[in-house]
From Swiss-Prot:
Its main location: cytoplasm. Coenzyme M binds at residue 121. GO terms for molecular function: coenzyme-B sulfoethylthiotransferase activity. Transmembrane segments: none annotated. InterPro entries: Me_CoM_Rdtase_Fd-like_fold, Me_CoM_Rdtase_gsu, Me_CoM_Rdtase_gsu_sf. MCR is a hexamer of two alpha, two beta, and two gamma chains, forming a dimer of heterotrimers. This is Methyl-coenzyme M reductase subunit gamma. Its EC number is 2.8.4.1. Gene3D superfamilies: Methyl-coenzyme M reductase, gamma subunit. It comes from Methanosarcina barkeri (strain Fusaro / DSM 804).
Amino acid sequence: MAYERQYYPGATSVAANRRKHMSGKLEKLREISDEDLTAVLGHRAPGSDYPSTHPPLAEMGEPACSTRENVAATPGAAAGDRVRYIQFADSMYNAPATPYFRSYFAAINFRGVDPGTLSGRQIVEARERDMEQCAKVQMETEITDHALAGVRGATVHGHSVRLQEDGVMFDMLDRRRLENGTIIMDKDQVAIPLDRKVDLGKPMSSEEAAKRTTIYRVDNVAFRDDAEVVEWVHRIFDQRTKFGFQPK
């Protein structure tokens, strides 16, 4: 019988959403063009070539290596792309994703990525075209509600601030906002103004966000209501504590 990955315990909607994020089997909610993605990221001009940091691997004449022969380079590494990033902040008020689960999603579903997890933001670094592939999936699917999440390369504050009156997460640099029922972004991730308004789609209703979130909250799905999750968290902490002290 083929092994089926379990990813995460639990019987609640939050646990199911966490499994979906980790598996990469995500529902696509919106379309973002490659040019709009490039504009939002701000690393190069839309339509321009990828700058490189070294020649393509095929031209470098590297020495024989069994690992290199068995593990194909990612497209970005093969082309010699420089390393670039995308960084998200996710609201504590039922945003679909959390920093840890963005990192799990990236590490499980993409090669050559370096996810970084902090309390209020999450960054993925990779060769530029590889990073863009990971970024596009996150920006187009249910892992992101652009009213409750922001692409923020600098001044990331807002994840723990209560939502604005229009239901949008606060952004001190005003990179994106609600206009005519959709979220638009007219600055890149470090707040440099764009020559266009990038349409990031309609925000989720508060009811839909509560169904799609990966966050346990006492006013939605409480952590202690998911008995299997509590059991496994206790088991992991118990074993880490005991064996961290190396009991004799």
